[in-house]
Amino acid sequence: MNLDQIQEMWQRDSVIDPDNLHDESLKIPQLHAKYYTIYNTITLLREKAREAYNRVKLERYNYYTGKAPIEVYEEEPFPYKVRDKEALQRHMDGDEKLSKVELKIRYYDIMLKFLEEVIKTISNRTYQIKNAIEWHRFQAGFN
């Protein structure tokens, strides 16, 4: 599941039918469970990506410092050993393999931020429904 799919799903689920407020209030626990399940899944995926990042970071560190197995250099030659910390950091920052995993972690962070806001909105939905009911009562002349 990607961010676009979650956003489209929320766009459909976020609509409150003003004519069926009682049904909408009953859907709140289901929506909470649905989006919290997605939140937990994405959190686990992010943790796996962090684990992969640490593994790739060690592999790339060994690669740039000349400590990787010979087979690695046969597949991907690197003629020098980087000994300077600053140069090593520049190589690590520019490393494509490391950047891909880091980008995945950032993507998961964005998804989690969106889901946190969705869950917060779902939690506040009872107040929105209550306000809508009070507005209907006010319009009907009941106080």
Per-region residue spans from a language model:
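Charge-rich amphipathic alpha-helical interaction elements
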Residues: M1-N143
